[in-house]
Curated annotation (Swiss-Prot):
It comes from the Bacteria. This is Putative membrane protein insertion efficiency factor. The keyword Endoplasmic reticulum does not apply. Keywords: Cell inner membrane, Cell membrane, Membrane. Belongs to the UPF0161 family. Could be involved in insertion of integral membrane proteins into the membrane. One of its GO terms (cellular component) is plasma membrane. It comes from Campylobacter jejuni subsp. jejuni serotype O:23/36 (strain 81-176). Transmembrane segments: none annotated. Its main location: membrane. It is a peripheral membrane protein.
Length: 113
């Protein structure tokens, strides 16, 4: 998606040129990146837009993780978990309200043992 490429370009080349001034964690650009990865374009755009409007001296700041909606389906009782999954876990879904979750990114890399 083009939005993800633009955000990564901003994070890699433009963001290091200015001082860190975001009042929230994760930063506004990281928040936008997570939103565009997990939501459709319009919802991600408006969530990011309102987040940037809140990122000013008149707001307290602090932790503001993205909230996403997701339906989880029950697992078959005969399901046998595979602990050596081929796909690495990237995000945690922390329950917020009914079918709404905080999205938290895992930043540690898995080491082979």
């Amino acid at each position: 998606m083009i939005c993800l490429k633009i955000l990564r370009f901003y994070q890699k080349f433009l963001s290091p040129l200015k001082p860190a001034a975001c009042r929230y964690y994760p930063s506004c650009s990281e928040y936008a990146l997570w939103q565009f990865q997990k939501k459709n374009f319009f919802l991600a755009f408006f969530s990011t837009f309102f987040r940037i409007l809140r990122c000013n001296p008149f707001f307290k700041g602090g932790f503001d993780y993205p909230r996403v909606s997701k339906n989880f389906y029950p697992i078959n009782l005969c399901f046998k978990p595979i602990f050596l999954a081929k796909k690495q876990l990237c995000f945690l879904y922390i329950p917020y309200k009914n079918k709404s979750f905080y999205l938290i990114k895992i930043i540690f890399k898995r080491t082979n043992q």
